[in-house]
Amino acid sequence: QKRGKTWNAPQNLGTPLNDEEDNAVTCISADGKTLFVLNAYSKTGKTKVGLSKSRRTINGWSYPEKILIDDFQALSHDEIVDGTKIEKTYTEFSITPDEKVIVMGLKRSQTYGERDIYASFRQSNGSYSRPRSLGPVINTADMEGSPFLAADTKTLYFMSKGHLGYGNGDIFVSKRLDDTWTNWSEPLNLGPPINTSEWNGYINVPAASDYGFVSSKRSKNESHDIYRVTMPPQLRPEPLAVVTGRPTNLMTKKTIPAEITLRSVNGDSVNTVSIDLTFDPEEDGEYKFILPIGQDYVFT
């Protein structure tokens, strides 16, 4: 947690999020109450490759629930580590604020190269569709990964070794041009000083901000560190608005249980938030929506 200009020492979140496997948070919901974590957790068997979801409760974080993705594959590939060839399996995920789309970097049987980027869409039963390749504008015969889909759901940042770059993996940005999710603008290299002659990736650009965070290796003899970078206007996502609030009793001013639905004027549901105080009596009741500007919305 950042206080002023400095960060507190990191705290181990403990079980059930951390276990004997490699653990990582891939996304955090806008209200900070939901974590999407790597691995498909299982109380009855061994943790497998995949994605799970955990909610913050009065007793801590809930046991991560596996997110179901049709025909999910994550194949391994050979990698040289300290001169030794080993098999590695990589999975990377980015989720839209409304949780309707998951963008992922992984290797499947039909992958163009070493790793590609795919999109999967939430279905009526709550599971997600078979991953759809983002196509040859994004994916090359080499490696693409560490995708980050900005909150506008149109601006995609990703790492690539196949597009022309400065080093051993650069960060690029591309804009989605339609709803097929296969039609994208030509990827633009973010350039120096964001990209270096070494590996760069795992960018995260907070909503309604002019900066981002990247994992970067600045020189051959350095390790990967996290850096904050200023995003030039041409590299930023489309403008967004962050809307927050809290349902309260008009007389007592206390937070009350509620289900809040946000709809665009054409009737499409943008997002729904439930505030259940019977489940968590310490629930502060605050909700948060991230919205494209220039549109009209209705709260119910």
Model-derived segments and spans:
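Short, conserved micro-motifs composed of acidic
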Residues: Q1-E259, V265-N271, T278-T300
